[in-house]
């Protein structure tokens, strides 16, 4: 489908077809191996013992076992399905997203507070009814790798559904141009089945009132990450009768981050994931598998290899985390208020397109100062495991790579969009992410 609304994609990301295939196979395998490695028999004071990748992979059951396991599928589908129903029925304020290419704006229900409150209440009730045993958390901990594999398979099927559905015209409504044509992602309409399936063909796939992309971004993966962390804390306490300060710290740091993201979810509406990227395997796998099953790596590690930090290290790590939060939120708030016309005193560059490029306040320090704050937060999580193993620093390294890629994508887009105005902006704000470093 090629039209004025949906032109043919001519620029490919991630190495095109070969890169899409490599990531679609390599990242899931990497995620499974990573989770297989967090086992007591593979660690002595944080170092690998008798590491054998073949043995690790052989510890995974055949694919047909997971495809046909009704119990695992029931558990995961109930998790996704119940959250989807709650997302639709729980109250929340309705906000408009950014203007789309057809001139329309989609409506989004912002009900993160109601969703978070519901989850906390359910956990509290189950804690009371089971005398603190919480068999659901025990099941999650004991079937961690199996549920990881199920989430990957679910991501595959969800991406396939969204790809096929992208070819079906709008049925119950028309787009902003008065036609039945769906809006496709500019980067996902190449005509190559595998690449478009991976990168995401439809921009905003919806199933009735459910926006699949925004829901997947904020609900099943993020909240499962929280539960996995709690299951690690719960398992360690049941096993040893005590909890180490590092494990408590990781639960606090990441729990704070998760609830902050859910409670401030309206900020997602202007993120590239929502405004620009289609919803394909890349986002489905990232949201549903990579986030919960690799971001929880620190908690998983500390549940099998405890670390006692002491209050000095705890305070230092907290300071790094809150510094990151301050930079991240202050910078984002400043840019948001500037766009709303509340901070007209800040210096900016007037572009030929009629918009302004902010180059003052936080945004005089670097082009993506918010990325630096976000990365400091990620570093604090890894530091909670101290320097026992490089494995737990995976997230900080991965996140740095992700932020660099986003920065380069944004820079390429802005060069094309603003031309000489962007060159002037780069002269005034030369640093990309970290002031005086990069």
UniProtKB/Swiss-Prot annotation:
Predominant location category: membrane
One GO BP annotation of this record: ergosterol biosynthetic process
Lumenal side: 1-13, 91-109, 173-242, 329-368
Disruption phenotype: Leads to the accumulation of ergosta-8,14-dienol as the major sterol.
Record keywords, A-Z: Lipid biosynthesis, Lipid metabolism, Membrane, NADP, Oxidoreductase, Steroid biosynthesis, Steroid metabolism, Sterol biosynthesis, Sterol metabolism, Transmembrane, Transmembrane helix
SS bonds (residue pairs): none
Biological role: Delta(14)-sterol reductase; part of the third module of ergosterol biosynthesis pathway that includes the late steps of the pathway. ERG24 reduces the C14=C15 double bond of 4,4-dimethyl-cholesta-8,14,24-trienol to produce 4,4-dimethyl-cholesta-8,24-dienol. The third module or late pathway involves the ergosterol synthesis itself through consecutive reactions that mainly occur in the endoplasmic reticulum (ER) membrane. Firstly, the squalene synthase ERG9 catalyzes the condensation of 2 farnesyl pyrophosphate moieties to form squalene, which is the precursor of all steroids.
Further information: Present with 1600 molecules/cell in log phase SD medium.
Protein's name in the database: Delta(14)-sterol reductase ERG24
């Amino acid at each position: 489908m090629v039209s004025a609304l949906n032109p043919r994609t001519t620029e490919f990301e991630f190495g095109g077809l070969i890169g899409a295939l490599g990531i679609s196979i390599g990242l899931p395998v990497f995620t499974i191996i990573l989770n297989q490695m967090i086992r007591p028999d593979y660690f002595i004071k944080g170092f690998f013992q008798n590491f054998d990748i073949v043995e690790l992979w052989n510890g995974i059951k055949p694919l047909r076992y997971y495809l046909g396991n009704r119990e695992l599928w029931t558990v995961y589908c109930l998790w996704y399905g119940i959250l989807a129903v709650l997302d639709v029925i729980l109250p929340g304020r309705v906000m408009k997203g950014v203007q789309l290419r057809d001139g329309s704006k989609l409506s989004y229900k912002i009900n993160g507070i109601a969703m978070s409150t519901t989850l906390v209440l359910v956990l509290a009730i189950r804690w009371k009814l089971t005398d603190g045993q919480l068999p659901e958390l025990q099941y999650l901990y004991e079937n961690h790798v199996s549920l990881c594999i199920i989430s990957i398979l679910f991501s595959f099927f969800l991406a396939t559904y969204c790809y096929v559905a992208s070819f079906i015209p709008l049925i119950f409504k028309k787009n902003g141009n008065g036609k039945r044509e769906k809006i496709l992602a500019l980067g996902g309409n190449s005509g190559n089945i595998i690449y478009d399936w991976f990168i995401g063909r439809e921009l905003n796939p919806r199933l009735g009132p459910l926006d699949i992309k925004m829901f997947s971004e904020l609900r099943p993966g993020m909240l499962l990450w929280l539960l996995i962390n709690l299951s690690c804390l719960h398992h360690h306490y049941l096993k040893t009768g005590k909890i180490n300060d590092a494990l408590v710290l990781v639960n606090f740091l990441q729990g704070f981050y998760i609830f902050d993201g859910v409670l401030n979810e309206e900020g997602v509406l202007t993120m590239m994931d929502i405004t620009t990227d289609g919803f394909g395997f890349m986002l489905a796998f990232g949201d549903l598998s990579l986030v919960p099953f690799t971001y929880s790596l620190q908690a998983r590690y500390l549940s099998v290899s405890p670390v006692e930090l002491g209050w000095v290290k705890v305070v230092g790590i907290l300071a790094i985390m809150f510094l990151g939060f301050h930079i991240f939120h202050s910078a984002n708030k400043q840019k948001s208020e500037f766009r709303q016309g509340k901070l007209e005193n800040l210096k900016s560059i007037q572009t030929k397109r009629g918009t302004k490029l902010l180059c003052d306040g936080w945004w005089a320090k670097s082009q993506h100062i918010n990325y630096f704050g976000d990365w400091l937060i990620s570093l604090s999580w890894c530091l909670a495991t101290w320097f026992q193993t490089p494995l737990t620093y995976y997230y900080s390294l991965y996140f740095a790579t992700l932020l660099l890629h986003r920065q380069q994508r944004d820079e390429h887009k802005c060069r094309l969009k603003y031309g000489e105005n962007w060159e002037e902006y780069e002269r005034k704000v030369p640093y990309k992410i970290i002031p005086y470093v990069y």
